[in-house]
């Protein structure tokens, strides 16, 4: 066997430079008993918990690979539900930061998550148009609600009734009866997508936000209240003065007429509209926990805040209005003998008042509201430019003014990072964007310097790591001092964008290339500072090489004899540095070369192009050694690992790949970024790689000591592709359901397939062991003595348990959320054995609840085959008897426990009442004593 080249694996080390991703929503979370101080923010595949007071990241909820799209804290504040791009939902504990519960049911990104009032159920809406209700306590799905024709945008539980209301991009608002999982009402009064909805006024009013500047209000009348004869007729609210009889309002009246027969549980009628100041669509619509503050925003940077008055406040307002109207009427009819009859009508504007506007520093992506203990309204915003802002507002004042109380900025750039560099000691990392330069400590990932700059395109640390040079989009060179964090000098270098710079190997100067078709050579020099007597670093231009095309990239050879220049005409030209004479032309790319690098020994040059290819050339003759199809989109950056012929490429396909330039092999792919990668940097030691992407994140990759074998890597890649294909296969057909309609809550994943395989293996083992035991009994009978039975090593590893107990342990080991899907994949040939074993287990009273759940599901999906199988008839008869008796026993035990808990509750309440009265009497006695003491003091003074 020949020697194989050994590579070392690079792994993801950390994500930094990111405050919050744009796809998800920001929410307040309760930590350490404090409300309003901590917020959870989506950060690519993770969730960051930020302390708003200190501006620090205090907890990271680790995700897998998919991007976070939705967050929802539980009512008790102990858990956080997180929805992902692939449709998965994970529930994290905010105490430990671990995600123990995973729900897989949606086929597309999760768009909405909402807990019910007690936190026992979770409703999730998705881009796959389905709504799924999950049982959080049992860690399983309850049912899937199908009806929307486009992505679901919002789902809300009603507090007092077992109902759910959902909105979607299909312009529909649907009401669901959760007792029978049926959509009993569809509201079709919207002409555009419904982006949000809230319930206010004790759930008797629904407010919806669509793709226009209106917030529509709908009155909800519940059946029980309509049927109650003692209930007075609700007041008819007039529509806003600005709303005419539009075709939409006609539609809503037609809808009301047509749906009278459908009003089994409730009826909806349009109450009017509130006009927003923004003209674009509603992005987010929310109400605070008190139900008094309503807020919404569009695609701009303004949050509009409204106050919803209570019945008493509205009545008070109406009384004032009526009094004013009567006074006016009396003045107008002073000559008439009879008092005129006056009446006032209540409009929607009397009930919902505009309070204030909160203007943020950038476009709002999401927000959340909370009331502080002092009564102030706090609004936290996740902005488009990687920023979190907190505003406070006292809504009780006549003209409240929002005040910005906190801001998290230092942890990231406001725009995409376009250039990265490592210091010579591998410790500092420079990142530069459109408005600022940041210096990061690689070990702590903390930002240690922030300096304002122009739109940066390229950068490097000056030898000595005390200064940095930036090349900008306007063609300037900017020189910064790191110790003071100041701009030393700005030099006009090029007439167009300065696309690339390369430090000379002798470290005395550098070369720049720009869009003005020029390559310029610069030397470092010391000049006297005007503001002080000390000398400072500066640069001076020495030579210029004029070319026929825009320069995109420049690179020195390590011996400083050659200079490679990439041009807009898709070629790379190589020149002698000393004479600037032409040496080689490297042509073959179909689109311009965006990046290139020369190996440490000067033997190879690798070029990456917008045509998605990487070409490896020899620098001696300019021959192309190999052309590699590297990425699925443009190759944006290319760097050799120091002192090797290995190089990294970064592409717009969100991937970083490592290649061997000698063997022309793909070594590994570093996946993590969710959008285009703009740049990367390799540390001088080669141990670290840092990359920047359009998803605003900076990622650090670290070289481990783990050897990477290419054959194993290819095998792992094939396994991953197979697992992906298994998950994409169609669901097994269930009798009674049409093809393509899946009303079960789960979906087929590789985990459910593996769970089904574990059940099959356990049943096979049970069959084998049962046969062995029969043989063993026959041998013992023939021998007339007890012969030792060989023990199965698997059973011995589980504590020398019986084969049937091993089957039960296998069922108990399957996740609750994956149980139904695993049973759905299980072939029918194993079902008779499973039913027989279930009968044994239930008779002994083992895990009755779990086994009944499995049993009823198997009976449901294999009903036809089970009933037609004569051999299973006695088993089913026995199961019928045992399940009824054992379930009753469990029911009785639960009833007894509930009665016991009720008794304890009453005892505690009685004790607390006694304590309350005891405290009250002691307070009264203390007050009497104080009064007596005061009287004595007064008497002594007199």
Swiss-Prot record:
Repeat (WD) residue spans along the chain: 21-60, 63-102, 105-144, 147-186, 189-228, 277-316, 412-450, 452-490, 493-532, 546-585, 588-629, 630-669, 672-711
Record gene name: Wdr3
Source domain of life: Eukaryota
Protein name: WD repeat-containing protein 3
Cross-link for Glycyl lysine isopeptide (Lys-Gly) (interchain with G-Cter in SUMO2), residue positions: 473
Subcellular location, record wording: Nucleus, Nucleolus
UniProt GO BP: ribosomal small subunit biogenesis
Function: Part of the small subunit (SSU) processome, first precursor of the small eukaryotic ribosomal subunit. During the assembly of the SSU processome in the nucleolus, many ribosome biogenesis factors, an RNA chaperone and ribosomal proteins associate with the nascent pre-rRNA and work in concert to generate RNA folding, modifications, rearrangements and cleavage as well as targeted degradation of pre-ribosomal RNA by the RNA exosome.
Ranges of compositional bias, category Acidic residues: 247-260
Protein's UniProt keywords contain Repeat: yes
Originating species: Mus musculus (Mouse)
SMART domains xrefs: WD40 (SM00320)
Subunit note: Part of the small subunit (SSU) processome, composed of more than 70 proteins and the RNA chaperone small nucleolar RNA (snoRNA) U3.
């Amino acid at each position: 066997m020949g020697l194989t080249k050994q590579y070392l694996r690079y792994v993801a080390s950390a994500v930094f430079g990111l405050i919050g991703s744009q796809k998800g929503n920001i929410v307040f979370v309760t930590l350490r008993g404090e409300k309003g101080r901590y917020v959870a923010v989506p950060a690519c595949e993770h969730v960051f918990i930020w302390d708003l007071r200190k501006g620090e990241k205090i907890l990271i909820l680790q995700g897998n690979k998919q991007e976070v799209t939705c967050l929802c804290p539980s009512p008790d504040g102990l858990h956080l539900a997180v929805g992902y791009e692939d449709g998965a939902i994970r529930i994290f504990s905010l105490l430990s930061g671990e995600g123990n519960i995973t729900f897989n049911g949606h086929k597309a990104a999760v768009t909405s998550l909402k807990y019910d009032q007690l936190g026992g159920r979770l409703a999730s809406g998705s881009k796959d148009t389905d709504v799924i209700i999950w049982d959080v306590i049992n860690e399983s799905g309850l049912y899937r609600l199908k009806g929307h024709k486009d992505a679901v945008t919002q789902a809300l539980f009603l507090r007092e009734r077992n109902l759910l209301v959902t909105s979607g991009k299909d312009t529909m608002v649907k009401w669901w009866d959760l007792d029978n999982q049926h959509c009993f009402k569809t509201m079709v009064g919207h002409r555009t997508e419904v982006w949000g909805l809230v319930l206010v006024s004790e759930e008797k009013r629904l407010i919806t936000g669509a793709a226009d500047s209106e917030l529509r209000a709908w009155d909800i009348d519940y059946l029980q209240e309509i049927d109650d004869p003692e209930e007075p007729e609700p007041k008819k609210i007039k529509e806003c003065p600005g709303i005419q009889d539009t075709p939409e309002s006609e539609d809503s009246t037609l809808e009301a007429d047509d749906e009278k027969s459908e009003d089994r549980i409730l009826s909806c009628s349009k109450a009017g509209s509130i006009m927003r100041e923004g003209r674009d669509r509603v992005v987010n619509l929310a109400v605070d926990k008190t139900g008094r503050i309503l807020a919404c925003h569009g695609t701009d940077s303004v949050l509009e805040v409204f106050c919803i008055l209570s019945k008493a406040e509205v009545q008070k307002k109406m009384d004032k209005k009526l009094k004013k109207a009567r006074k006016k009427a009396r003045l107008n009819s002073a000559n008439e003998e009879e008092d005129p009859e006056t009446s006032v009508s209540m409009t929607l504007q009397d009930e919902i008042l505009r309070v204030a506007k909160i203007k943020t520093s950038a476009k709002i992506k999401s927000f959340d509201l909370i009331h502080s203990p002092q009564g102030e309204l706090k609004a936290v915003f996740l902005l488009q430019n990687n920023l979190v802002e907190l505003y406070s507002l006292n809504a009780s004042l006549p003209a409240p003014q929002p005040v910005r109380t906190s801001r998290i900025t230092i942890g990231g750039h406001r725009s995409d990072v376009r250039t990265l560099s490592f210091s010579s000691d591998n410790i500092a990392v420079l990142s530069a964007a459109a408005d600022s330069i940041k210096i990061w400590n690689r070990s702590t990932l903390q930002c240690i310097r922030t300096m304002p700059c122009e739109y940066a395109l390229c950068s490097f640390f000056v030898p000595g790591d005390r200064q940095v040079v930036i090349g900008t989009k306007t063609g300037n060179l900017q020189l910064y001092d790191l110790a003071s964090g100041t701009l030393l000098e700005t030099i006009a270098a090029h007439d167009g964008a300065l696309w690339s710079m390369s430090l000379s190997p002798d470290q005395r100067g550098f070369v720049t290339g720009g869009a003005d078709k020029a390559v310029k050579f610069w030397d470092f020099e010391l000049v006297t500072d005007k503001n002080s007597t000390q000398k400072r670093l500066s640069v001076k231009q020495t030579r210029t090489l004029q070319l026929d095309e825009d320069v995109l990239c420049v690179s020195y050879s390590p011996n400083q004899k050659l200079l490679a220049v990439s041009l807009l005409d898709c070629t790379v030209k190589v020149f002698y540095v000393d004479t600037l004479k032409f040496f080689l032309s490297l042509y073959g790319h179909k689109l311009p070369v965006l990046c290139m690098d020369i190996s440490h020994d000067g033997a190879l040059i690798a070029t990456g192009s917008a045509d998605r290819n990487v070409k490896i050339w020899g620098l001696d003759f300019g021959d192309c050694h190999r052309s590699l199809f590297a990425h699925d989109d443009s190759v944006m950056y290319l760097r050799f690992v120091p002192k090797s012929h290995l190089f990294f490429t970064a592409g717009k396909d969100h991937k970083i790949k490592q290649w061997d330039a000698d063997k022309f092999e793909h070594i590994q792919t570093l996946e993590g970024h969710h959008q285009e990668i703009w740049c990367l940097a390799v540390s001088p030691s080669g141990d670290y790689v840092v990359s920047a992407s359009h998803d605003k994140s900076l990622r650090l990759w670290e070289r481990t000591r783990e050897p990477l074998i290419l054959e194993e890597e290819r095998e792992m890649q094939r396994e991953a592709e197979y697992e992906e294909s298994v998950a994409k296969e169609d669901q097994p057909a269930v009798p009674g359901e049409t093809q393509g309609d899946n009303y079960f809550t789960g979906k087929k994943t590789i985990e459910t397939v593996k769970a089904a395989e574990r059940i099959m293996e356990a049943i096979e083992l049970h069959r084998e062991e049962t046969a062995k035991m029969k043989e063993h009994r026959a041998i013992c009978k023939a021998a007339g003595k007890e012969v030792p039975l060989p023990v199965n090593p698997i059973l011995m590893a589980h504590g020398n348990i019986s084969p049937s107990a091993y089957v039960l342990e296998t069922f108990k080991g399957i996740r609750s959320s994956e149980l139904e899907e695993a049973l759905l994949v299980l072939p029918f040939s194993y079902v008779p054995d499973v039913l027989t074993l279930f009968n044994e287990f239930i008779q002994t009273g083992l895990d009755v609840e779990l086994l009944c759940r499995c049993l009823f599901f198997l009976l449901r999906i294999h009903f036809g085959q089970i009933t037609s199988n004569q051999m299973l008839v006695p088993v089913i008869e026995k199961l019928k008897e045992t399940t009824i008796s054992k379930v009753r026993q469990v029911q009785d035990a639960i009833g007894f426990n509930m009665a016991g808990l009720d008794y304890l509750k009453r005892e505690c309440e009685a004790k607390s009442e006694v304590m309350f009265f005891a405290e009250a009497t002691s307070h009264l006695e203390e007050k009497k004593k104080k009064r007596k003491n005061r009287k004595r003091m007064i008497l002594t003074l007199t």
